[in-house]
């Protein structure tokens, strides 16, 4: 059960970048996890690329 919980947490980390990158389904799950780390760095720096991904994510939530 502990392994399943840990796997569920990593799935959340993978799903979030997938929601932000709906058009880029070609990205494998491993790259999705790495992209999560890059996204956090972009949030700290406030790059325009990161802000451009937010509207795409909102579309997915709608």
Curated annotation (Swiss-Prot):
Residues 60-62 are annotated as: Melanin-concentrating hormone-like. GO terms for cellular component: synapse. Residues 44-56 are annotated as: NEI-like. GO terms for biological process: chemical synaptic transmission. Signal peptide: none annotated. Belongs to the melanin-concentrating hormone family. This is Pro-MCH variant. It comes from Hylobates lar.
């Amino acid at each position: 059960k502990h392994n399943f919980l840990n796997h569920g947490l990593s799935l959340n980390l993978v799903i979030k970048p997938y929601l932000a990158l709906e058009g880029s389904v070609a990205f494998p799950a491993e790259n999705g996890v790495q992209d999560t780390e890059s996204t956090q760095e972009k949030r700290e720096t406030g790059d325009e690329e990161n802000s451009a991904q937010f509207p795409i994510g909102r579309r997915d939530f709608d």
